[in-house]
Amino acid sequence: MAASIPSDLRNLRACLLCSLIKSVDAFQTDGCENCDEVLHLKGDEEKVYDCTSANYDGMIAAMSNDDSWVCKWQKMQRRVKGIYAISVSGSLPSNVVSDLKSMGVRYKANQRDYSIQAKK
């Protein structure tokens, strides 16, 4: 399985859980191919805006995740093929974090937000 590759660089957002980059429409239509089991973005515009961010840095085209040193460096080996952000600013809403915790999904706020880590 692979995520749809964005054809337009405007109005893109990155998933706050896995950093997959897609358009708002693609998140609404297909959800997040990595996270929709737990985030349930498909068909929910409000949740798409809550669980994604338009503020991200850099892009990685991950096409061969198991063989790529970049995917290993970014801990993306088990993700679908697609375009990923190197760094994503923002964090999931507290109610979503609580839901993730109850499902046994580990989430560390700002884990992939390197702008915050650089300020420390």
Swiss-Prot record:
ZnF (C4-type) residues: 15-35
Name the segments for region: Interaction with spt-5.
Answer: 1-39
Q: Which UniProt keywords apply?
A: Activator, Metal-binding, Nucleus, Repressor, Transcription, Transcription regulation, Zinc, Zinc-finger
Gene3D superfamilies the record matches: 3.30.40.210
**Which Gene Ontology cellular-component terms appear in the entry?**
DSIF complex
What would be an example GO MF term here?
zinc ion binding
Under SUPFAM superfamilies, the record lists: RNA polymerase subunits (SSF63393)
Q: Which domain of life is it from?
A: Eukaryota
Protein location: Nucleus
Where is this protein primarily located? nucleus
Q: Which InterPro entries match?
A: RPABC4/Spt4, Spt4, Spt4/RpoE2_Znf, Spt4_sf
Gene Ontology terms describing biological process: regulation of DNA-templated transcription; transcription elongation by RNA polymerase II; transcription elongation-coupled chromatin remodeling
Keyword rRNA-binding recorded: no
Please report which protein family the annotation says this sequence is part of.
Answer: Belongs to the SPT4 family.
Q: How does it assemble?
A: Interacts with spt-5 to form DSIF. DSIF interacts with RNA polymerase II and with the positive transcription elongation factor b complex (P-TEFb complex), which is composed of cdk-9 and cyclin-T.
Q: What does this protein do?
A: May function as a component of the DRB sensitivity-inducing factor complex (DSIF complex), which regulates transcription elongation by RNA polymerase II. DSIF may enhance transcriptional pausing at sites proximal to the promoter, which may in turn facilitate the assembly of an elongation competent RNA polymerase II complex.
Protein's name in the database: Transcription elongation factor SPT4
Q: What is the lineage of its organism?
A: Eukaryota, Metazoa, Ecdysozoa, Nematoda, Chromadorea
What's the name of its gene?
spt-4
